[in-house]
Regions:
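Cationic, low-complexity basic patches in intrinsically disordered or flexible, solvent-exposed regions
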Residues: 3
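Short, Lys/Arg-enriched N-terminal segments with co-localized hydrophobic residues
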Residues: 6-16
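Conserved active-site and cofactor/substrate-binding residues in soluble primary-metabolism enzymes
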Residues: 21, 41-45, 82, 119, ...
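Predominant activation on well-ordered alpha-helical scaffold segments within soluble catalytic domains
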Residues: 31, 44-47, 51, 85-88, ...
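Divalent metal-dependent catalytic cores for phosphoryl transfer on phosphate-bearing substrates
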Residues: 60-164, 174
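A structured, mid-to-C-terminal "fold-capping" secondary-structure block
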Residues: 154-204
Length: 204
């Protein structure tokens, strides 16, 4: 029963007894539905960013945060038209905890689902998902092709350029910052720092 844990204190929802997968189990499930290396790397980046913030704000539940990041786009490659809908079905079929399912689905709030980010962790996922893509695209324009020497100012400049990485929703990023009560500049700086902490591990 080592994978059945209580995260009730974290979610303020009482005792939770659904299955919380290990990171390895989650990766295996992710690869069952995703083969594109870009999608797999994005999942690892968002997972790493979530872990970075968890160590600051919720150190007792770092792996839970990382799992939410890893699985957030579980259905995107095979079911793009049902994104954040199909993944709920898949996770329920595997007996995953409803708290994890809610966290994963909530990053599609007002885009594909009406599952609202309620907890701080869910708001972090919602706010940083699109932003990691923008930062990654900005890094590729940098001479070093890496986030290592990137500045928040450079990211903010690209944020303002509507034609750059147009698939990264500026509205979602702004809304995420508002949900967290952070300024846009603060969100950019913190997320960039998170990605820089992962530069060696994920070759960013």
């Amino acid at each position: 029963m080592k994978h059945i844990v209580s995260i009730g204190h974290f979610l303020n929802r009482g005792v939770i007894m659904g299955k919380i997968p290990t990171m390895q189990e989650a990766r295996e499930l992710l690869k069952e539905y995703n083969q594109d290396e870009f999608h797999l790397k994005h999942a690892e980046i968002v997972s790493g960013v979530m872990g970075y913030f968890a160590r600051q704000y919720d150190p007792e539940h770092v792996e839970f945060w990382k799992l939410a990041g890893l699985l957030h786009d579980l259905d995107f490659e095979k079911y793009p038209e049902q994104h954040c809908i199909k993944e709920q079905e898949i996770m329920r079929e595997h007996g995953y905890d409803e708290a994890l399912i809610h966290a994963v689905a909530s990053h599609g709030y007002n885009l594909t689902v009406d599952v609202k980010p309620e907890k701080f962790m869910e708001k972090v996922l919602y706010a940083t998902d699109e932003l990691t893509g923008l930062i990654g695209a900005t890094a590729l324009m940098h001479p070093a092709k890496s986030v290592r020497g990137l500045s928040p100012k450079s990211v903010k400049k690209k944020f303002k350029s509507k034609g750059f990485a147009a698939g990264c929703s500026r509205d979602v990023i702004r809304n995420g910052a508002d949900m967290l009560g952070w300024t846009l500049d603060d969100l950019i700086a913190r997320t960039l720092a998170a990605m820089q902490s992962l530069a060696d591990e994920l070759n960013l």
